[in-house]
């Protein structure tokens, strides 16, 4: 599949280590994901201009993937669910591997679930780092009402970015659903070093009502 649009297409990770037992780290909706594990082992960072006479050779020998030296994931369920993820890429001839870290905390209290997810990426080739912090919640006051939200902050190249999503859903029966939501991503919000954001500098308001009728012979 070739994507000719101006927006990056999200593809889920099929590598077993990253795909399995990963629900604790899943803070996302269709516009963004705080963690996109396909970034780990992805296209390396390059700056071929620093290699002088080898600059053209560097440009012609860029790799599309990075080798992974190691990856670690630990989760623990309890009153406070805890998760930690770390991975380090291997250095190659014209690039230096990045280091990825993620920390997840999540807890429940009656009908309220809330948590924190933070990521940090160290990029030694460019001597830069990327940090994202997010707070998410899910509130279920009754069987038919649902409220959720995600507040995000990024710090990339010393620039702070902010975003939030919030939604309300009403499901009085299995055949009817109605909901509204808002999304705000400012022009400096950048999740893409370890996450996914289809586009920033957007404010969106959306609503949906659905009626479903099913009959069986």
For every predicted segment, state its role:
Residues 1-217:
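Outer-membrane beta-barrel channel domains
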